[in-house]
A protein has these predicted regions:
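Flexible "cap/lid" loop of the alpha/beta hydrolase fold
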Residues: 130, 134, 140-174
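Conserved alpha/beta-hydrolase "acid-adjacent" motif
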Residues: 248-254
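Catalytic active-site module of serine/aspartate enzymes centered on a nucleophile-bearing elbow/loop
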Residues: 265-300
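Short beta-strand/loop motif that positions the catalytic acidic residue
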Residues: 235, 241-243
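Gly/Ala-rich beta-loop-alpha elbow adjacent to hydrolase catalytic centers
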Residues: 121-125, 129
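Conserved alpha/beta-hydrolase catalytic His-Asp/Glu region
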Residues: 177-222, 226, 231
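Conserved HGGG/HGGXW glycine-rich cap/lid loop of the alpha/beta-hydrolase fold
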Residues: 29-90
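Conserved acidic catalytic loop of the alpha/beta-hydrolase fold
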Residues: 99-117
Length: 300
């Protein structure tokens, strides 16, 4: 029986369209660092917080990021930016820190002319969005947190977590430029294990283009030592907390800890091993429905 995946083909065409049509803008953060940002789609604004490493153009073929940004851009004006030190934003920067990540989010809110909007927060973007929402409660109408965590590995109770954090940071800084099979290939396997071999291989290659070996070590240090547990009770915006049950990048108990500390949150778990969810994951349609339903309530 011949089967044709029309929906998948349509999604790929839409992603190519978004990637080709987007115009890269630049703005300055408080300390003068140049930040690259884009917008796709139309309608009420949604802004994506910085998460893991990325690249505004390459994100459209990132198996775990492309589905969610495509889905949201199909219905809303989605504003995204590359965090300092990676992607199309400035790489030569004096400071890569959690506070600067929050400053950068504020700078893009201003540059895009957004007074108030929901935030799409993936991975450590959930912590950045938390801090931003506490600093600017009137500007955040809601937060979607995917694969989020309030405590970096080095701040967790387990000695094994702390040891892994140090080992991973050292390996990233030392072996980021290695050829296949590289640490980047291992990361792709951990982040999106159910993506196709070709998708993971491409993602691993793209990571090399997203950030320098020096900056990945600095970047990882910030992620490993973040701690927003004291800020969670101060977030007034409604939060949708989405985590996969068998996520190897960030354990689901971090998602539960995140949700339990937020005064106005809803927690949903998915039967998946992915950290970010590819379109081929059987749980993706349910996650997409949950996200769009939440945004229908809270996007102005």
């Amino acid at each position: 029986v011949l089967s044709v995946d029309f929906e998948g083909a349509e999604s790929r065409l839409r992603r190519e369209q978004y990637a080709n049509e987007q115009v890269v803008h630049f703005c300055k953060s408080k300390d003068g660092v140049g930040l690259a940002w884009v917008e796709n789609g139309s309608g009420p604004p949604i802004i994506k917080a910085p998460s893991w490493i990325g690249h505004l153009k390459l994100d459209w073929r990132n198996p775990g990021i492309a589905p969610v940004i495509t889905s949201i851009a199909n219905h809303y004006r989605l504003v995204r930016f590359d965090a300092r030190g990676n992607g199309l934003s400035d790489w030569e920067v004096d400071e890569i820190s959690f506070e600067r990540f929050v400053d950068d989010l504020e700078a893009v809110f201003d540059a895009a002319g957004i007074e108030r909007a929901p935030i799409l927060a993936i991975s450590q973007g959930s912590a950045v969005a938390t801090a931003f929402a506490v600093r600017n409660p009137d500007r955040v109408s809601a937060i979607i947190m995917i694969g989020g965590f309030p405590l970096g590995r080095a701040k967790r109770k387990s000695a094994k977590d702390r040891e892994r954090a140090e080992a991973m940071r050292s390996m990233m800084a030392a072996g980021w430029d290695d050829d296949y099979p590289s640490l980047r290939d291992l990361l792709a396997e951990i982040i999106v294990p159910t993506a196709s071999v070709e998708e993971r291989r491409q993602y691993a290659q793209d990571m090399k283009l997203m950030i320098s070996p020096e900056n990945i070590g600095r970047y990882r240090g910030v992620v490993d030592y973040l701690d927003v547990t004291d800020l969670l009770p101060k977030v007034s915006a409604p939060c949708l907390v989405l985590n996969c049950q068998n996520d190897r990048m960030q354990p689901i108990d971090q998602g539960r800890l995140l949700a339990s500390g937020l005064p106005n949150s809803r927690f949903i778990s998915y039967d998946s091993p992915n950290h970010t969810v590819p379109e081929s994951d059987p749980e993706w349609p349910r996650m997409e429905r949950d996200i769009l339903s939440f945004l229908a309530e809270h996007a102005a």
